[in-house]
Amino acid sequence: MVKQFNIAICGSARVGKSTLVNALCGKEVAKTSSSLCSATDEMKKYVLNRSCQSVNEAASSIEYSITVWDTPGIESWTIDNVQKHFTKIMLESTPLCMIYCASPGSFARLDQLQWLVETCIKSNIFCALVCTNKYSGGNQQRTQVLNDFHSLLTHYHTMTRDEANIKYYGNVALCTSVNSIIYEDIDIGVRKGVEGINELIFGIITSLKDDKLVAWCYTIAENQLFWSTMRDKVVELFNISRPILEELLQKHGKDIARYLIPLIMKAAFKK
């Protein structure tokens, strides 16, 4: 049995969409480019196929197929473009979430983003609005991007909490800022490491339910840094027995995700 899901990555060209996809997945899934001609009019897709490791030996095998869609630069979109692209995505398989990227100082039209967010929320698609390349502009530009995100999302849901540099709007949306790869400016002697990726992944985990939650976990299954760094938070969130997990890891190796995701499934479908 194959369960199919889609993730849409949206935003203007050259804001770090592909870099973010690779950082989330923990490996190179999407091709990156520094070219000024990196915009494209066609959607690209990257398919991740995962086999479900059931905690119940007798259970039938389940495959999860997750397609990550890298959409064309949104700056040229009209409302018809939004509807066309998302109709295509929704007809392909179950939409999991939409991740919108904007970097400090990048071109953004809030009316287009509003169409996008409204389309997703009406279709029960979780929205993550992300300020990418957070150090590529000044603090003022970064703050402006995040303020625009917050202002837009409060039209659809009040902010329910603010944790680990992430603002949550119920189980409808979140917004945050990240640095997907090391940022370095030799001229002024600034070097910033990767920031916010683990927190973003965990934030989406806390916001999704049932099969969408499981599909997201399989999307980031190979991100070993996330699973090793955030294991305790995941175990606490789903009230997973630590002794059981430790026993599995000692017996079968240190691939945390392989044994933790089935335990997450068991806890998620029990709720």
Residue ranges and their predicted role:
Residues 72-80:
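Flexible beta-alpha connector loops of hexameric P-loop NTPases
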Residues 231-271:
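Membrane-inserting effector segments that mediate pore formation, membrane fusion
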Residues 20, 99, 200:
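Residue-level signature of catalytic and energy-coupling elements of molecular machines
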